[in-house]
UniProtKB/Swiss-Prot annotation:
The keyword Membrane does not apply. This is Ethylene-responsive transcription factor ERF061. InterPro entries: AP2/ERF_dom, AP2/ERF_dom_sf, DNA-bd_dom_sf, ERF/AP2-like. The gene is ERF061. Residues 135-192 bind DNA. It is found in: Nucleus. Keywords: Activator, DNA-binding, Ethylene signaling pathway, Nucleus, Transcription, Transcription regulation. GO terms for molecular function: DNA-binding transcription factor activity; transcription cis-regulatory region binding. Probably acts as a transcriptional activator. Binds to the GCC-box pathogenesis-related promoter element. May be involved in the regulation of gene expression by stress factors and by components of stress signal transduction pathways.
Amino acid sequence: MEESNDIFQNNFSPKISEIRASLSQIILAGGPNTLDSIFSLLTPSSVESATTSFNTHNPPPPPQLGSSVYLRQRDIIEKFHLQNRAISTPHPPLFSSTYDHHQTSELMLQAAAGSPAAAFAAALAAGRVTKKKKLYRGVRQRHWGKWVAEIRLPQNRMRVWLGTYDTAEAAAYAYDRAAYKLRGEYARLNFPNLKDPSELLGLGDSSKLIALKNAVDGKIQSICQRVRKERAKKSVKVSKNSSATADSSCLSSPEILSSSPVTTTTTAVTSEDSYWVSPMGLCNSENSSPVSVSVPSEVPATAEEEAMMGVDTDGFLLARMPSFDPELIWEVLAN
């Protein structure tokens, strides 16, 4: 006993002093976990010598990093992870060093038994995994297992049925062929880089593939012809309606079509010796009674008016001026 006490004092007396000094510093400084910080200061050699001296007969346990609080949190996180990832096939846990596949399966069963929601989520996920299939554009499945190919016309968005097929790939190929016929290079295809359709469709006989192509081409051709006929009928109806409206407007206003000679109304003013001629008409100066006469604008009414229109006064032709009356002007100047 005395020898063992001497060995302990000789080997660990300096280490204990170091631990005391570091412990006071750690407590004053503070940190996430005091125990982890304390034992992290020891070197691996000192820890190994201590374990071999005190536990010579017992084998050392597997090393675990962190304190008991950390391990507890790790277990809780692992449990939550397994509950959220409730699927049919077991997956390795987050920390594979402490758990094996047998423990993960047991934890999954416990989570399913503890919460019905987890069991329902596991069943739903398993159903999604087993029933997940590839979806194609323009293809839908009947409830009895057959596959239907459909496409919409770019003109009026009308749905066209392309046929019923045994496989989804055959229906997708029918849609691709119809889409290329309608839209050309702008079509969105299920198999844009397909070279040999027989390999994809699984048709050993080429006659089936040819029959599929002919059926789709005939369907698209007939639909396009029907759309053209409907457009032609609509255009004919529109033209007939426009012509009928034009005829009715012409019949309601016949005066537009009739042409009459253009005449001008002139008013003359008659007096004893002179006349006042204007394009607006003839008017009597003595009686001041207007007399309306319809006379063509190109031919003068009388010879006197023609002579009067030719009168030249000081080099200016004043025949068409409304105030032209030479006798009245001289009378005014004399007075």
